[in-house]
Amino acid sequence: ELANALEALGVKGIQLGGFGHFRDSGMAGSPSHENSRALVNRIDEAADFLGEELEAIDPHAILTYGPDGGYGHPDHIAVHKVVMKAASPSVRIWYGIFDRAANYAGLETLDAPAGWTKPSQEYLDNFTNEGADVTVALSDAALDAKRRAMRAHASQIWLADGSTTRTNPASAVAALHEPERVPGAFGLSNLLVMPLLPAEYFQLGQGEPADDLLGGL
């Protein structure tokens, strides 16, 4: 799934230590979380691997999770820690977020597919963040790549556009009342519908403020 998503985005992937070197950490309290090979238990090792890659790449900017890991998943939080430990203090770092206002507004423009529901305020507030510093509007081509990358993660994401996969063989269709503003919808395995927005949102985590991701670099 990851390889297919990277291909859809035109991104070259680097697997730190090789595929399977770091194990999924699961949620706190689970056996996976206690596994000595889990990413959450190997932050320093992962940071060493990443530091070597960053030294070779010398990036102008880094996109990663914020301190909350997006919605609190331990592996996402671990990735944040690894990046902050490995990155040079001078490199600009952006946290990718689900913008709270944009997602609340987006949900108002759609109806959930049959059998799905809209998320509660508690869920939304945990899933989203307030105050994006930079909003990147997506071109039609970029939005199409985003859809294909999301569809590639069939065990994680279900697009509510009528498409099917081997993982999700039954189609689901959300009613989109303002498709120019919200051109799609998706859900996780919990079948809570979320708007698929034609933009990406970022908060500045490190470096000089800018009006766009590479501004002034």
Residue positions per predicted region:
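C-terminal accessory domains and tails appended to enzymatic cores
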Residues: 11, 27, 52, 57, ...
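Active-site beta-strand->loop->alpha-helix modules in alpha/beta enzyme cores, enriched
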Residues: 1-89, 214-215
